[in-house]
Each structure stands twice: as C-alpha cells, then as structure tokens.
Amino acid sequence: MAKLTKRMRNIREKVEVTKEYDINEAVALLKELATAKFTESVDVAVNLGIDARKSDQNVRGATVLPHGTGRDIRVAVFTQGANAEAAKEAGADLVGMEDLAELVKKGEMNFDVVVASPDAMRVVGQLGTILGPRGLMPNPKVGTVTPNVAEAVKNAKAGQVRYRNDKNGIIHTTIGKVDFDAAQLKENLEALLVALKKAKPTSAKGTFVKKVSISTTMGAGVSLDQATLNTQTN
C-alpha cells in the first residue's frame, strides 16, 4: 500500500469530504493547505444538470472575471490592415497573417490565446490540426473569432476564462491564484456561475448547477454550499 505523503495526510485530516463549506471557510482552508513551492491556482469544477451526449445541451462560452486570473496572458492575433494596428494598440503580443501561420507551423507558439478576424480564418483554418488539440483554435462562441479583435485582446488580457463542459457535464476552469484574497475569489466564482446560468441550454431540465467545488493546483477539492454565493441573474 502506497505511503501517504505528509501533505496528503494533512489534507485528509482537514477536509471533510461530505461537507459543503461556506465559500469563505473553503478559501481559508485551501490557503492553509497550499504548501507547494509555487503560487498555486484556484480551480473550480461545476457539475451541470445536462446530458452531455446531446449536442443541444452542451455549454460553451467565455466570461471576464472581475479580478482576472493572476496569469500574464500572451495573445496572438490573425488579422490585417487597420485591425492589425488596433490589435497591437490593445496589447496583442503577436499580430500577423501568413507570417504568423509560419511560426505556428514551426512550433513557435509562445502564446496562450489566439484571436482571429473573420477574414483571417482562411489562414487560421489551415492550422486546425496544430491549434485544435492545444485548445487554441479561435471560435466565435467564445469571442475569439470577431471583427473587433481589439476588444477580444483586451478581454483576454483582463482575465477572460473560457469554459466548456466535458463528457460528464462538468466545467473545469480557474478563478485566480491562492494568494488572491477571499473576496476576490468569491467575486470571480460568482461571475463565472452567473455566466454559466445565463448559458443554460433551453433543453436542460431540473437543477442546472448541481455541485460546485474548488481546489488548488496540488490540493484536494472542497465542496461549496451554494447558498453562500450570490449568483442571481438579472
């Protein structure tokens, strides 16, 4: 039988697996248990009441978190003309068309998000086998194929998170870093949950957000009491 590490023993002692924690209590617990030698991310898993086998019940989109994710995001933009200048002014790290495509083909992909204007998709479309498996292919559903590339760049830089349910109907994404204060993490999580509720498929029946749990990069998941979150949609 594998020997438990000191870290895992500590987690087992502190985390009650059947308990739904108040958000502030949960964040305090994650901070206490985050002992890695780097600043861990705070990740969230949201179990949705959908049938992921049905295409009309899949949930996909993007939202800007009010306090960002704590990451420096590098953005590559496929566009030309006036849009290229607008993208650069908005803070894009790489801007181009065929020249940028050549870098991608060579494996030089020093970026986290790819944005494209509609007229550039003839170039980007040829890169699907490279960008697709890495989750980098631009898509209008998450706002990365758009005529307004400058806004897309600003959103990405401001801490936009993209979300998509997996085959089990669960959304996995990040809501910040463990060194964020509790209020920032709470507001980021609430913003994400509001966005998810607005994206609820019309064909999904019953309780939509079934379970919410948060964890750090190296830590265990902590289930949340949703009553301690303000996720009312207008």
From Swiss-Prot:
Gene Ontology CC: one annotated term: cytosolic large ribosomal subunit
Role of this protein: Binds directly to 23S rRNA. The L1 stalk is quite mobile in the ribosome, and is involved in E site tRNA release.
GO MF annotations in UniProt: rRNA binding; structural constituent of ribosome; tRNA binding
Assembly and interaction partners: Part of the 50S ribosomal subunit.
UniProt name for this protein: Large ribosomal subunit protein uL1
Highest classification ranks of the organism: Bacteria, Pseudomonadati, Pseudomonadota, Gammaproteobacteria, Vibrionales
InterPro entries: Ribosom_uL1_bac-type, Ribosomal_uL1, Ribosomal_uL1-like, Ribosomal_uL1/biogenesis, Ribosomal_uL1_3-a/b-sand, Ribosomal_uL1_CS
NCBIfam families: rplA_bact
Family: Belongs to the universal ribosomal protein uL1 family.
Keyword vocabulary terms for this entry: Repressor, Ribonucleoprotein, Ribosomal protein, RNA-binding, rRNA-binding, Translation regulation, tRNA-binding
Organism: Aliivibrio fischeri (strain MJ11) (Vibrio fischeri)
Gene3D superfamilies, alphabetized: 3.30.190.20, 3.40.50.790
GO biological process, one term: regulation of translation
Stored Pfam families: Ribosomal_L1
